[in-house]
């Protein structure tokens, strides 16, 4: 097909450039030995700390972003079954789609073992693991989009009635009464919610991807299956493949990368090769 391999292309590019740079001393040494040219300039990667929030601001952002992630988990999983969000940890991996180089295979295998271990212990703890890995897809899974719409309808309906419910709670308290369902909710309100919940509920298991993946033999999807990560009710480790960029306007999570990370508990980056870049 008259295509050159990556090494030849990189070597020619390095030796043809007017100025050759790398991002660290380690990659500079590698470039000199492998590509045959010593970089003239090293442009070290780094973070501008002043652009990032303080510890106090991060704590607040964690709570706000975590609540939005939990809302996503609610409409993603709860139509099929429920679990305690208070006992749920949020993990993530993010990066280019390089299945082995980024250690996705290692992570999936480890999550499979963790899932088995937590199930044997009958742990109350659950873990939701996001794979924020942009890849080719055919758009949002319509089932998930419907789940979100049904959930938002229920939430908005309750919010619309919340002022009246609050008044009843306050009145019961000042009258030294214990608030109960019959005094707080009207029959009409409960009947409407019952109808909404029937529509909201689904059978089967939640999808393992938010979007329709074109490749039926995708290694991540196959890896989930082989590791026993099927998002079944008894699985303690839940996986969510999120194959789009986190722009804050994706239609599901609607958080930026930094906000998504701030709302999580742990990021995992088991890269096979990472040249300090």
Write out the residue ranges for each language-model feature.
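Catalytic cores of nucleotide-sugar-dependent glycosyltransferases that transfer UDP/GDP/TDP-activated
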Residues: 1-277
